[in-house]
C-alpha cells in the first residue's frame, strides 16, 4: 500500500472518530443537575437561569433535582438519574471507594457547614460526653465523617454512641423534640437550630469540614467533555454573581429554604465562595479525611486511600472555572 493511500486512510479514520465524538455530544438533549440548600451557588445557578442560557442555542434542556444531602447526590449519581451532583469532598471519596463512578471537578464552597449540636438542657459540652448518648446523623455525609473523626480524637468510636440514622431535616427535628441527645448538624438547618431554638454547637472544627465539590459521572465526562466545560462556565458565572450580589444571594437562600434572614446570615457567615478550581488543597483535605476514616475503621485497611483520591479529583476542567 502506498504512503499516500495509508495517509488518506488514517485521515478518514480520524475524521470518522471526530464525527463520532461530535455525534455523541450532539445526542445530549437534557442535562440533569442537582441543587441543594447546602450549595448556595447551585441555587443562584438555578434561579438566574445561567445554565439554560448557555445551552439553549443547542436545544439542550436542564432538569433540576434536589439533593437533601451528599448521600442523596451520590445515590442519584450512582443510579444515573443525574449527571452532576453536589457533595462534600470526603463524602465523594467514600462514594468513589464504594464503586460510585464519579469525578470531582469543581469547588463550589469552602464551608464550615457541620458541627456537633445539642440542646441547652442535655449537659453535653464536649465530645467525650457523647458516650452512651443518642446521636442523629446522616450516614455517608460530611457531618457523619465529621462525627467519626471527632469521636476518634476523643478516643471513642461509633460503637460508644447510639447512632440514629436520619436525613438532615429529621435530625434537627429529633434533636429539638428530645428524641436524640445530639446531632451531627448541617447548614442551613444547623444555623436554624441555633437561631430559632437556641441549640448549641458544642464541638466545632473548621479544618475537619471538607470542601463542597461538584461531581460528574465518569461516563458523561468521558463522552461530553465540552459540555462539562460549559456547565462549569455557567457555574462560575453563578459563583461570581453570588460574590458580588450578597443581598440577592441571601434572598435566594431565604426563598429556597423558607428560613429567616437571620438564619441565612448565620449560614453565610461560615460559607466561603472565593474558590472554584479543584486542585492540591482539596486533595490534601480529602486525603486527610480519608486516612482518618481508615484509621477509625470506616475505610478498610486494604484500600489505597491516596490512589482513590487521585482517581476522584479530575483537574482537566479547571480552566473552565477561571
Segments from the language model and where they lie:
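Conserved C-terminal helix/tail region of periplasmic/extracytoplasmic solute-binding proteins
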Residues: 294-322
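N-terminal export leaders
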Residues: 5-9
Amino acid at each position: 500500500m502506498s504512503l499516500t493511500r495509508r495517509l488518506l486512510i488514517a485521515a478518514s479514520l480520524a475524521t470518522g472518530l471526530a464525527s463520532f465524538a461530535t455525534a455523541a455530544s450532539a445526542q445530549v438533549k437534557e442535562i440533569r443537575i442537582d441543587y441543594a440548600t447546602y450549595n448556595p451557588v447551585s441555587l443562584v445557578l438555578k434561579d438566574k437561569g445561567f445554565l439554560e442560557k448557555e445551552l439553549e442555542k443547542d436545544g439542550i434542556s436542564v432538569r433540576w433535582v434536589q439533593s437533601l444531602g451528599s448521600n442523596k447526590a451520590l445515590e442519584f449519581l450512582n443510579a444515573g438519574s443525574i449527571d452532576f451532583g453536589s457533595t462534600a469532598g470526603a463524602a465523594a471519596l467514600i462514594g468513589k471507594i464504594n464503586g460510585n463512578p464519579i469525578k470531582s471537578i469543581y469547588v463550589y464552597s469552602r464551608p464550615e457547614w457541620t458541627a456537633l449540636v445539642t440542646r441547652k438542657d442535655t449537659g453535653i459540652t464536649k465530645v467525650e460526653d457523647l458516650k452512651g448518648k443518642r446521636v442523629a446523623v446522616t450516614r455517608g455525609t460530611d457531618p457523619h465523617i465529621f462525627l467519626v473523626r471527632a469521636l476518634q480524637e476523643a478516643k471513642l468510636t461509633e460503637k460508644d454512641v447510639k447512632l440514629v440514622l436520619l436525613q438532615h431535616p429529621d435530625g434537627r427535628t429529633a434533636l429539638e423534640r428530645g428524641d436524640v441527645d445530639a446531632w451531627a448538624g448541617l447548614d442551613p438547618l444547623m444555623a436554624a437550630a441555633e437561631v430559632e431554638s437556641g441549640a448549641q454547637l458544642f464541638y466545632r472544627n473548621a479544618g475537619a469540614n471538607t470542601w463542597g465539590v461538584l461531581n460528574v459521572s465518569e461516563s458523561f465526562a468521558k463522552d461530553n467533555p465540552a459540555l462539562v466545560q460549559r456547565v462549569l462556565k455557567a457555574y462560575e458565572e453563578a459563583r461570581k454573581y453570588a460574590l458580588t450580589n450578597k443581598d440577592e444571594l441571601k434572598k435566594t437562600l431565604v426563598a429556597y429554604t423558607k428560613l429567616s434572614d437571620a438564619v441565612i446570615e448565620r449560614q453565610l457567615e461560615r460559607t466561603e465562595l472565593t474558590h472554584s478550581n479543584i486542585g492540591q488543597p482539596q486533595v490534601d483535605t480529602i486525603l486527610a479525611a480519608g486516612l482518618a476514616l481508615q484509621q477509625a475503621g470506616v475505610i478498610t485497611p486494604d484500600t489505597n486511600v491516596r490512589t482513590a483520591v487521585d482517581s476522584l479529583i479530575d483537574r482537566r476542567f479547571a480552566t473552565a472555572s477561571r
